[in-house]
Amino acid sequence: MSATTANPPANRGSVLIPLVLSELRMFVRGKAGPIFAIGLPLALLIVFGNIPFYNEHRSSLHGYTLLDVYVPILTAFVLATLAFNVVPAALVGYREKGVLRRLRTTPVGPVRVLAAQLLVNLVTAAVSVVIVLLVARLAFGVALPRQIGGYLVGIVLAALALMTIGLFIAAASPNSKVADGVGTTLFYVMMFFAGLFLPIGVMPSLLQHISRAAPLGAAVQALTDATQGNWPHPVQLLTLVVYVIVFGGGAVRLFRWQ
């Protein structure tokens, strides 16, 4: 009687790393993701920075300029673009083309697929945020975040919260049209509550309360606090953690190969 030896399970890292590198190559080749996630917020910063109206110190903004206020919002813009437009389109596109179905026969599981997308977009977000902050500082004199620790905690939680929402959209959407529609709608709604069209500080009281509960609004307020030298309010950070848990768990639960 001959003994049979079972194949050892694939090392998780050996599966995830090539998957992340493959996703990163496809993201760069697609061009649309880098253009919208890196090029567009940088272009908006340059446009705003060259308009005198945005560089006037205002008593209504506690002595800050509109450009000072808009840099954290542009940071949120980066995260929202990736989370609501890039992530759902990529994953739903893979599902419709049968890529996910083929991956099902490999050691790759749904958690690794979602993790690879999350990592690629987090790296992209980090690059874009650093570029925005440096250009704002060097070209327009906008101060760098004064509370570095609080800023890092805020940006990481904001990125995770928004990316898990994007993964949830991808997992729950039956096709790319639905994913695009939901993602685009959420993008504009969330950017409104982030203060892109109307600074949060001058919103009516009701809208300010809604903004604090919205993921992007909580993110902008946390980043603004840290930029001004304060530790983000615990409620803002807790709000982001709740979004990570709820939508991250929902994305894994609803994930479909085909």
Where are these regions (language model features)?
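Transmembrane helix-boundary elements of multi-pass transport/secretion proteins
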Residues: 4-15, 19-97, 111, 117, ...
